């Protein structure tokens, strides 16, 4: 019913069913994992009005599992990528796997999928830093970087009358920086990946 993928490793489709509505994937050597993809295999859909809450568990210093809600998969959104590199320390959140005796070794983490009502899932809040960067966040970063550069560069602006002649320094007119800034913004709005070509 479910699959799990870690970059550089084989796809896992052998989720251990630990309860009627709960499934677990083991992630050995989890310390080297940055992102995890969880997906439906397409063979068995969720029952109507149901979906899967996706949890990440890692062992704390005492070996006890710490569970964190990453997000959700549904028939309408059958796959998701989660960033787990920043979640390997700290405290967990409420989860449905607490009363189960799931064996866990110090270097093995787990991905848990709990089949739940969509209404119940909508009331849960995944950990904020598990979401993977999107084009929107990249565009937002680029915009902030452009603004910062433009503000920094123009903070040194002086008029021609204020310039002290120095043959070893090169000056760039501020209107050239502004033109570049506006051109870059326009190109980013048209295609956020234009810089790759």
Swiss-Prot record:
Keywords: Cytoplasm, Nucleus, Protein transport, Transport. Belongs to the OPI10 family. The keyword Transport applies. The keyword Protein transport applies. It is found in: Cytoplasm, Cytosol; Nucleus. The lineage of its organism: Eukaryota, Metazoa, Chordata, Craniata, Vertebrata. InterPro entries: Hikeshi-like_C, Hikeshi-like_N, OPI10. One of its GO terms (cellular component) is cytosol. Its main location: cytoplasm. It comes from the Eukaryota. This is Protein Hikeshi. One of its GO terms (biological process) is cellular response to heat. GO terms for molecular function: Hsp70 protein binding; nuclear import signal receptor activity. Acts as a specific nuclear import carrier for hsp70 proteins following heat-shock stress: acts by mediating the nucleoporin-dependent translocation of ATP-bound hsp70 proteins into the nucleus. hsp70 proteins import is required to protect cells from heat shock damages.
């Amino acid at each position: 019913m479910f699959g799990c993928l870690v970059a550089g490793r084989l796809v896992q489709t052998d989720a251990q069913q630990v309860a009627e509505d709960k499934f677990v994937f083991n992630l050995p050597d989890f310390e080297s994992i940055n992102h995890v993809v969880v997906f439906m295999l397409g063979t068995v859909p969720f029952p109507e009005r149901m979906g899967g809450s996706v949890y990440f568990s890692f062992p704390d210093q005492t070996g006890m599992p710490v569970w964190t809600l990453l997000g959700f998969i549904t028939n309408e959104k059958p796959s998701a990528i989660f960033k787990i590199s920043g979640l390997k320390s700290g405290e967990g959140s409420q989860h449905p796997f607490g009363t189960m005796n799931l064996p866990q070794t110090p270097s093995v983490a787990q991905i848990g999928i709990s089949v739940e009502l969509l209404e119940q899932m909508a009331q849960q809040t995944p950990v904020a830093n598990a979401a993977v960067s999107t084009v929107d966040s990249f565009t937002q970063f680029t915009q902030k970087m452009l603004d910062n550069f433009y503000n920094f560069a123009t903070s040194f602006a002086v008029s021609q009358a204020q310039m002290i002649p120095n043959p070893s320094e090169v000056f760039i007119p501020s209107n050239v920086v502004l033109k570049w800034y506006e051109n870059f913004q326009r190109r980013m709005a048209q295609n956020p990946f234009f810089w790759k070509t």
